[in-house]
């Protein structure tokens, strides 16, 4: 390490050696990820996120000078890292793979947990991602201001804030922290309150914070920069000669620039004039950098409109790239600088392979899935697969007429649907949807999209089950009444009493010896047609097939001839719900059938 100057200041050469550490913010929905970053940077991005849940990765550079200002007199260390670059990963657990990309890019992570709610499903998922990528992390135990009796001290470090609390409040905080310690232990992590830790390589630090009041945030920032410098220093050393690599956050039209890319540069360097390869839904683009624009520090790249042009940018940084032919660039995919002696086509092939691994287009039965970015698509595909919902097509872009026709070709009514995340429906697709009556689910919040589809699917299943059971031929038995033969044949019309079960139109009848006699074509009571008759009713029925006096006689018992497949369903699913008279008729019917075939209906 180079020698520092006497006053503890860092030389420009030293600063340039270390890149800004990338910090990933992860956690459960509504536990305060975006609010925490808002508190740090003083912006209000959270207010215009759909459903107040961040749905696209954002990037915020917090310079060391701001961290020093925030921490005040508590800032005593001589630090060489230039600041922190926060990636605000989407809050909902469906974005596993987008988070995974964030996790793989991140040098450090903040796992934010509502101290009053504890671990939730997405908290656990975030931990698993961090474990998978071996990303060091700290826990921000948020919403301490909601502990009953808490006295807020705006932007105070934890030591000062705790000094103003009652003993009972401090005890409550301690209890909640140790509940988190217990939860973390379940997942294989030793943890403690950050100011009680001797070795951060072995113990996860828990930092009580309030994103609303700013309490504990100075401690959080100090711990992050300290960890980065102490344990990640070698990983942060920049090799300026290395060709840049980044992830495309968003594709945007900018006045005077045309189509631009918002990019997280996570490795190497990018310069004006560099040849770059950019991922698209189909073939990657090979183009040249026309301009590089960098937001002023403390500005979130999605929210900033005024940018400073620069000649080159070194990782890690959030930048805007202007170049020709970017119209089809795909958000969430890779951007790479072509280094000296490298083959652009070979790099394009690598990027294409990455994208093809996500896109799905098979002949199997499944839903049609459309999303606005490759990251959204990855998350949705993972979520649907986890729920065992098959996918026929998964692609980026608006809902097209072709998508509708593909959905209509799916014969399974539960899967003949289109799911659209944050995408529009093209006009010709809309008219086709109305014509073919294809269910379409749209939302710009992932969990809302999935919940609405799942709710519809459950209702549809119930409807289909009801229709299936209604189509089952039910047990029924009638006795032909004496002196009630109104017509002998073509069709035979006789008066009957329903002695058990139900009779309805178009059901076949058999005698007690198993002989088929004909099919009920009509049922009347007091000269009025009725759809069915139940036990105890006396009605007239018309029967196609028999002649009274030959195949059927007064006093005969006739049974509804239940198809064997239906008999199995009745035996397995419906028998326990049937009335006693229905059960008796069904068992007598089975007895008749099994005289000839003992395995019938089994």
Swiss-Prot record:
Keyword Nucleotide-binding: yes
Positions of the UniProt region annotated as G5: 210-212
Region described as G1: spans on this chain: 27-34
Gene3D superfamilies: P-loop containing nucleotide triphosphate hydrolases (3.40.50.300), Translation factors (2.40.30.10), Translation initiation factor IF- 2, domain 3 (3.40.50.10050)
Molecular function, one GO term: translation initiation factor activity
UniProt GO cellular component terms: cytoplasm
Region listing for G2, in residue ranges: 52-56
Binding site residues for GTP: 27-34, 88-92, 142-145
UniProt region (G3), positions on chain: 88-91
Residue stretches making up the tr-type G domain: 18-233
Alphabetic keyword roster: GTP-binding, Initiation factor, Nucleotide-binding, Protein biosynthesis
Region named G4: 142-145
Pfam family of the protein (one): GTP_EFTU
Similarity annotation: Belongs to the TRAFAC class translation factor GTPase superfamily. Classic translation factor GTPase family. IF-2 subfamily.
Matching PANTHER family: EUKARYOTIC TRANSLATION INITIATION FACTOR 5B (PTHR43381:SF4), TRANSLATION INITIATION FACTOR IF-2-RELATED (PTHR43381)
Described purpose of this protein according to its UniProt entry: Function in general translation initiation by promoting the binding of the formylmethionine-tRNA to ribosomes. Seems to function along with eIF-2.
Listed name of the protein: Probable translation initiation factor IF-2
Organism for this UniProt entry: Methanothrix thermoacetophila (strain DSM 6194 / JCM 14653 / NBRC 101360 / PT)
Gene of this entry: infB
């Amino acid at each position: 390490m180079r020698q520092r100057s006497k006053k503890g200041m860092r030389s420009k050469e030293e600063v340039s050696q270390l890149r800004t550490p990338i910090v990933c913010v992860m956690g459960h929905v509504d536990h305060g990820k975006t609010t925490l970053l808002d508190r740090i940077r003083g912006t209000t991005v959270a207010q215009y996120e759909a459903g107040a849940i961040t749905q696209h990765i954002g990037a915020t550079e917090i310079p060391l000078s701001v961290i020093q200002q925030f921490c005040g007199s508590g800032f005593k260390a001589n630090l060489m890292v230039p600041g922190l670059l926060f990636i605000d990963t989407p809050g909902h657990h469906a974005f596993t793979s987008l988070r995974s990309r964030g996790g793989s890019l991140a040098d450090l992570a903040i796992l934010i947990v509502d101290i009053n709610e504890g671990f939730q499903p997405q908290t656990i998922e975030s931990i698993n991602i961090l474990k998978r990528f071996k990303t060091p992390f700290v826990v921000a135990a948020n919403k301490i201001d909601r502990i009953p009796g808490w006295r807020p001290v705006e932007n105070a470090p934890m030591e000062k804030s705790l000094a103003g609390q009652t003993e009972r409040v401090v005890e409550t905080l301690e209890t909640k922290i140790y509940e988190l310690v217990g939860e973390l232990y379940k997942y294989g992590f030793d943890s403690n309150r950050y100011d009680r830790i001797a070795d951060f390589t072995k113990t996860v630090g828990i930092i009580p914070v309030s994103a609303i009041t700013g309490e504990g945030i100075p401690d959080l920032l100090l711990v992050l920069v300290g960890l980065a410098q102490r344990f990640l220093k070698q990983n942060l050393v920049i090799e300026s000669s290395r060709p840049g690599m980044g992830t495309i956050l968003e594709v945007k039209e900018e006045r005077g620039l045309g189509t631009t890319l918002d990019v997280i540069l996570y490795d190497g360097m990018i310069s004006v004039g560099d040849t770059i390869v950019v991922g698209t839904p189909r073939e990657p683009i090979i183009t040249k950098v026309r301009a590089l624009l960098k937001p002023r520090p403390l500005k979130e790249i999605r929210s900033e409109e005024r940018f400073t042009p620069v000649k080159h940018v070194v990782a890690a940084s959030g930048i805007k790239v202007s170049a020709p032919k970017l119209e089809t660039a795909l958000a969430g995919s890779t951007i790479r600088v072509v280094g000296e002696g490298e083959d652009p086509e070979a790099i394009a092939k690598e990027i294409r392979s990455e994208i093809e691994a996500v896109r799905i287009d098979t002949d199997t039965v499944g839903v049609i899935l459309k999303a606005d970015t490759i990251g959204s698509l990855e998350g949705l595909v993972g979520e649907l697969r986890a729920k065992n919902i098959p996918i026929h097509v998964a692609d980026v872009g608006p809902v097209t007429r072709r998508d509708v026709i593909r959905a209509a070709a799916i014969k399974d009514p539960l899967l003949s649907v289109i799911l659209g995340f944050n995408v529009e429906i093209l006009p010709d697709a809309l008219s086709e949807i109305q014509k073919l009556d294809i269910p379409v689910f749209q939302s710009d919040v992932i969990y809302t999209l999935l919940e609405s589809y799942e709710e519809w699917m459950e209702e549809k299943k119930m409807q289909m089950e009801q229709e299936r059971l209604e189509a089952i031929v039910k047990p029924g038995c009638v006795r032909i009444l004496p002196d009630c033969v109104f017509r002998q044949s073509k069709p035979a019309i006789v008066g009957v009493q329903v002695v058990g079960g139900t009779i309805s139109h178009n059901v076949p009848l058999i005698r007690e010896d198993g002989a088929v006699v004909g099919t009920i074509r009509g049922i009347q009571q007091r000269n009025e047609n009725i759809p069915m008759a139940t036990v105890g009713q006396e009605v007239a029925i018309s029967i196609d097939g028999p002649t009274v006096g030959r195949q059927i006689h007064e006093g005969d018992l006739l049974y509804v001839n239940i198809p064997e497949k239906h008999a199995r369903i009745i035996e397995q699913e419906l028998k326990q719900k049937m009335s006693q008279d229905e059960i008796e008729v069904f068992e007598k019917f089975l007895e008749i059938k099994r005289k000839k075939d003992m395995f019938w209906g089994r």
